[in-house]
Amino acid sequence: MRILCFGDSNTYGYHPRGFFGDRYGAGDRWVDLLAKQTGHEIINAGANGREIPRKPYALRLLTEHAPVDIFLVMLGTNDLLQGASAKEAATRMEAFLNQLLPHCMQILLAAPPPMKRGAWVPTDELVAESIHLAEEYKLLAEKLNIPFVDTREWNIELTFDGVHFTEAGHHAFADNLIDSLASICYDIKNTLRRCPYENGSCI
């Protein structure tokens, strides 16, 4: 099975050490850990600083990586950091997902783990918006009838900046995501949509 993980710096594996930052090794990035522990082909499509796309390039994204069984998207943190509310971020996410829904794959929406006070997160209001984002995404997933992963209860450890995962955070995220994938696998198996030119199966 091929899973495309579309996200921001926490999907990419950004490590905020040094002046310009760095990247965790493959053994400490949740995407690579997911691949190692499941045996599935996991595509890391994370990018530092990425917000929810507002330009219609979703089809190009699909053709670049086709065929894809599951499109896992986890975005919204950078939107909040740039001043958007949780509701505004959810509206952007809905517009983005509506570009993808007619085209082939199963979408899995994940809420980013909540931020905490830190070097990048100066206010409690920002933390509250990051918690509220999961509530907005849950409602959106119900509206679009797609699986949803709520990471709020995973207690992901974050670095000093209040945004990025620590190594332990990446490992915990991978473990929890594997459990979540297993719990929704029946639904994925029975709702899997894939490009018509490619026959495939789920987990």
Residue ranges of model-derived segments:
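Serine-esterase "nucleophile elbow" of acetyl-processing enzymes
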Residues: M1-A47, E51, L59-P67, H171-A172
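Alpha-helical cap/lid subdomain in secreted, periplasmic
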Residues: D28-L33, Q37, Y57-I203
